[in-house]
Amino acid sequence: MQTIDAGVRQIALLADDSTDWGAQYGNDNTYVRVLKDLTDWIHELQQEKNDDGTAKYEGLKDTILYCPALYSYTGAGDAWYKDIPSNVQIVMTGGRTFGVASKDFADTFTKNTGRAPFMWINWPCSDMNRNTAYQYLVMGGQNNFLKPGATYGTYDGIMLNPMQQSEPSKQGIFMAADYSWNLWQSEKDGQQSWEDSFSYIDHNSPIASKGSRGLRDLAMNMRILNDGGIDGAHKDAEYDAVNKWWINNESVDYTGKLDVKGVLTELKGKLDGGTATAADFSQALTVYTTLQRAAKNYRANPGDKNMFDQIEPWISYWDDLTASAIDYITAAKQALAGDTEAAKATYATAKAAFAKSDTHTIADYYQRNKPARGGLVIVRP
């Protein structure tokens, strides 16, 4: 009641991570009853008037979000959901903790319960960086967390769990809004939304700027999402069980203009096989030079100071990482040309820059300072 008096106009009953009291006492005696009582109470408050006849709690909604203790829903039934008042929206994470908004999940849930789910997607959530030695940004991943094919009525709604950094989380929020409004019917719809997002989150315009293009080029290499293995093994093709992260098309350029993944993967294969040539290194040099320029362009032309301030540790990381990679490549080319002494000196410079890239820290979930990193799948040397 204190929050409503303070101005809150919608309430929720959030039982996630709580005891499943329904299993002990019966759901009709616990959550169904509580939700019916809450609904009746809100309806009573909606009828209250001030002395002048105006509504005492103007704008108070009777729409209640209810998140069950068993919020992931694995298809076990729960037909009792049909007894929940129609004004209550049932929150589901989509089959696992780091779940997915998909028509398949929603159709199964609706068939078994008689209700459409309100999706709570733990994306672009970066909470699990509490288990890593570094801090990362999740600037993509719609291909794994927002599946095309939904129609009107598939979901009651969608909400996201953002990153620890609120401003760059707007990139995921932009895509979720586009997904909900335009109902993506193909993966290309999601790719286009990803491309379109940066000019809007940077300077609220459909026209890209030098700064937003720089942010976009870096974000292409900062897409992973680590779930810490909380849900066990996944069958997802893009889930790396060793690193416990979704790759999320990291370093894949949807426009095809800069083949970061292709160039660097091919170079690594040739290095492992001892067949790399100066031409191979030159292609990689183009990749790292482009990323170095992207960091400089975003630093010099940010459209939103708050956004830049939260991302800055990663921009400094990219400054040093690309300088390191460029020097490593230069040293390799010098060695191939027979200039051993120059190669040694350049290698030492590269090594120092690489070490410096880990000095740009930011507090994690538990307020422990850790280095900001990106390009963890392909780009980081």
Q: Predicted regions: what is each one?
A:
Residues M1-R9:
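Chitinase-like catalytic core of GlcNAc-active glycosidases
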Residues D5, S18-E195:
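Catalytic-core regions of glycoside hydrolase
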Residues Q185-R380:
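C-terminal functional modules
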